Amino acid sequence: MQLKKKKFESKISLSKDARDGILSFCKMNHPNEGILILRGKAKRGNVFIDGLVVPPFSETGADFAGFPHNPLPLDPSYVGIVHSHPVGSAEPSLTDLNNFFGLVSMIVKSPYEDDDIFAWDSDGKEIPLVVV
């Protein structure tokens, strides 16, 4: 017997505190990229993000940001990552997609204002994002 996997429409809900923390972090790290782990809950395609974690041993530069995944504790509240693009668009690069972590990848483009945050799935498709 073959079971069909239900496909849910994804939606990302971001708390105002998390949004403000993301934007502040990106502004502080400019002109370098910044990277954070997103903390929250997921159910039936909906992801609610209410916390941020600075990844241990992260490295950033003008055109890269990353961290090794192996020293991370096993934490089911880690739902994805967010990083900044100081120059250019907020679309994920091939490198971004190849280093996908969790359920969602958010990218913030300069000048790091409320409308400069975008969410993507592992296929590079944009996911609707609302601030709550």
Where are these regions (language model features)?
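Conserved, mostly hydrophobic/aromatic
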Residues: 81
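Conserved beta-strand-loop surface patch within small alpha/beta domains used
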Residues: 1-78, 86-132
